[in-house]
Amino acid sequence: VLTIEHAPAQAIPAKEDGFVVAALSLTPSAWDKESNFQKLASYARQAAARGAQVIVAPEGYLEGYVGNEHRTPGLTREKYAREAAEPLDGEMLRRVSALADELDVYLMLGFAEKRAGQVFNTAVMFAPDGSAALHYAKSHTMNDEPFNTKGDAFPVARTPFGTWGTLICFDRQVPEAARILAVKGADTLFVPAWGGYGEMNDQMMRVRAYENGVNVAFVHPKRALLIDASGTILARSQGDGDQIVMGRMRVDPKRKHSMLKYRRPALYRELTQDAVTAP
């Protein structure tokens, strides 16, 4: 396990088991997609040169997370869609795809996605060949994201390193979201985020890993955590400056099986009944 702050100087030795994840804890510039892409490319190249096979950037990284009304007071739907959002097949995302291809890595970042006349808070994972291996729209949003349409699916990606799923920021606070990904076979969850972080979040991420028997990579501009399926923190950021946090994750099928085999789904039907409301 290796935590690298600011300027990485050491590689993680290559091994045959598991895979090396680099969490890019970077603060992007609001509205400056070109600058943010250049920073992403610089840090991704450093991480890849030191053995990273999977590289992940935070929520809303490309446009600088401007879709939150606390970060951008007075934002209008029209300005957000016109100046912040990008289509998945647009020029900016093609450049990110090409970067994954160039570095021969899996590369994930968050961005405001323009799709079917709407904008989604999206995370996309490009595979080493540049294809989109995992494409997810944030499904749980609070009232501070008035212009983002909620996603309605929990996709998983089957890769040579295991089965992966993703949650975005507030999704992680909804236990059912992580659980459905685990039930669908995910053994590693990537969680690009922006909002809250700190000790309470660290504990919550450890619980999500433990209760589902999955690895978790939490990636925030001010915090990064790599956690194994037992809830142990493998690596974490130091301070709140731009940095790369690297560690090796391994998949233990026995761990996930032990967490899920005692479930009794028939007892949980009330969770999906519209008539059931919170007090």
Predicted segments — roles?
Residues K33, S42-P128, R179, G198-Y210:
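Cys-nucleophile CN-hydrolase/nitrilase-fold catalytic domain and related Cys-dependent amidase chemistry
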Residues V20, M108, T122, A153, ...:
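Conserved beta-strand and immediately adjacent loop positions that scaffold enzyme active sites
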Residues T27-A30, Y61-G64, K114-A116, M142-N143, ...:
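Solvent-exposed loop/turn segments at secondary-structure junctions
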Residues A85-Y106, T163, C169-R248:
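CN hydrolase (nitrilase-like) catalytic-core segments centered on the catalytic cysteine
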Residues R94, A98, K114-K184, Q203, ...:
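Active-site catalytic loop in hydrolytic enzyme cores
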Residues I4-P8, P13-A48, V54, G60-Y65:
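N-terminal, active-site-proximal structural segment of metallo-dependent hydrolase catalytic domains
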Residues I12-V21, V156-G165, T188:
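Beta-strand-turn-beta hairpins that frame and shape the catalytic cleft
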